[in-house]
Regions:
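Substrate-binding/catalytic subdomain of NAD(P)-dependent oxidoreductase enzymes
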Residues: 141, 147, 159-192
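Aromatic-enriched alpha-helical interface/lid elements that frame and gate functional surfaces
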Residues: 200-272, 276-278
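Nucleotide donor/acceptor-binding cores
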Residues: 2, 166, 210
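Glycine-rich beta-alpha junction loops
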Residues: 34, 110-112, 172-179, 209, ...
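Glycine-/small-residue-rich "gating" segment that lines the acyl/pantetheine channel
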Residues: 130-140, 189-200
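Active-site-adjacent beta-strand anchor residues
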Residues: 6, 79, 171, 214-216
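Active-site-adjacent capping/gating segments
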Residues: 39-46, 191-192, 198, 274-300
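N-terminal helix-loop segment corresponding to the beta1-alpha1 unit
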Residues: 1-162, 296-300
Length: 300
């Protein structure tokens, strides 16, 4: 069993570590003496991300030697330290590879190119903002953190499988751009950002009793939707932002439950917009990462 030393707190790094654990890696997580701040931010998420790992507490400011010893026993190191911080603590790839030259070292860093100062402190919203993925309202989900964690786990899994070794960076800024790659590509192609919510076929509408999300990306679904709500005249206006107001008027007078039933019956990609409490009842966090290993008994 390959062993991973996780030098990470909060979200992206621990997510990668948990995914690796599900793939059969042994994960040893190093936390500061006060523990991972996620313990206080969300005890539930801390448990989800770190259950099954062996956790050790080390004060890197005064006892980096303990981490170097753990690194000598590991096949891979996963870290979210800024490069300057890893160097200052003596746990950089350069330092750890002195004793373990065949080490896999994957670092989730902030910035990897010339897009911004390399060591600038940032979080999910900052990376998304620089990638053109933040509108007037802040993003509600931490998609960049999740993307970076997935990429880090995939990188370590792939390197271990093919016997590769060395240092690899996963820049959060690039993960943010990857999350937004469709819009970046549409802009490069000179085409409108059709999934921005400005167009009638892909947005959120109010109805009696709540809201619904319409995702009629394919023309056949837009046509099916227009016929179902009695507005065949809107079929040619799929790419007309002004048609959104017409749809708003129609759906505002319809019951959300009836709309959901209509969508299911006619096979239209329209669903209710649940609040966080309704979503929690359907998707308990404790179960979300169970079974990502296809060999797991939990998937059978």
């Amino acid at each position: 069993m390959a062993k991973v030393l996780e030098l990470a707190v909060l979200f992206p790094g621990p997510l990668a570590g948990r995914l690796l654990l599900e793939q059969g890696f042994e994960v040893v997580k190093v936390e500061p003496p006060g523990g991972d701040p996620m313990r206080q931010i969300s005890p539930t998420l801390y448990k989800v991300l770190n259950e099954g790992k062996r956790v050790v507490h080390v004060d890197l400011k005064g006892d980096a030697e303990e981490v170097r010893r753990l690194a000598e026993e590991a096949d891979a190191v996963l870290t979210t330290f800024r490069p300057s911080t890893a160097e200052r603590y003596g746990v950089s790839y350069r330092k750890l590879a002195e004793a373990r030259p065949d080490l896999i070292y994957v670092a989730i860093v902030g910035y990897g190119g010339d897009e911004y100062p390399r060591d600038h402190p940032s979080h999910d919203i900052n990376f998304a903002a620089l990638a053109g993925a933040v509108g007037p309202c802040p993003p509600y989900v931490q998609a960049v953190d999740v993307a970076a964690g997935l990429l880090a786990a995939l990188t370590i899994t792939a390197m271990a499988a093919r016997g590769a070794r060395g240092y690899v960076e996963i820049p959060m800024s690039r993960a943010a751009a990857l999350v937004n790659i469709l819009n970046l590509s549409l802009r490069r192609d000179g085409k409108p950002l059709v999934l921005s919510g400005d167009y009638p076929f892909y947005t959120v509408y109010r109805c009696r009793g709540g809201r619904v999300a319409l995702g009629a990306v394919e023309p056949k679904f837009w046509e099916r939707f227009c016929r179902a709500v009695g507005r065949e005249d809107l079929i040619p206006r799929r790419l007309d932002p002004a048609a959104r107001e017409e749809v708003e008027k129609v759906l505002a007078g319809m019951d959300c439950g009836a709309l959901e039933e209509l969508a299911r019956r006619e096979e239209i990609p329209l669903t209710p917009v649940y609040d966080i409490d309704r979503a929690l009842a359907i998707f308990p966090p404790e179960a979300l990462l169970n079974g990502v290993n296809p060999r797991s008994e939990r998937t059978r």
